[in-house]
Amino acid sequence: MPKRVLQGVVISSKADKTVTVKVERKFKHPIYKKFVKVSKKYAAHDSENKYQEGDKVSIIESRPISKTKTWVVVNGE
């Protein structure tokens, strides 16, 4: 099964080797036909501590690194 890749924005980089990434998605509501924006936060592994708040990054699914981290930052802008 291919690994999922998501794009988002770093909203916290306070923890060591960990960043919190906010991923937003839009979809059309099936009944009301209005576009709805939904966001979710992911804890991602940043081994070099090189990403700061506000950076746009891509994260990829990986094996569990800790209790809450199952994503790794692969690149940023």
UniProtKB/Swiss-Prot annotation:
Q: Which Gene3D superfamilies match?
A: Nucleic acid-binding proteins (2.40.50.140)
Q: Which InterPro entries match?
A: NA-bd_OB-fold, Ribosomal_uS17, Ribosomal_uS17_bact/chlr, Ribosomal_uS17_CS
What GO biological process term is on the record, naming one? translation
**Protein name (record):** Small ribosomal subunit protein uS17
GO terms under cellular component? cytosolic small ribosomal subunit
Q: What does this protein do?
A: One of the primary rRNA binding proteins, it binds specifically to the 5'-end of 16S ribosomal RNA.
What molecular function does GO assign, one term?
A: structural constituent of ribosome
Assembly, per entry: Part of the 30S ribosomal subunit.
Question: Family per UniProt?
Answer: Belongs to the universal ribosomal protein uS17 family.
**Alphabetical keyword list:** Ribonucleoprotein, Ribosomal protein, RNA-binding, rRNA-binding
Q: Which organism is it from?
A: Rickettsia peacockii (strain Rustic)
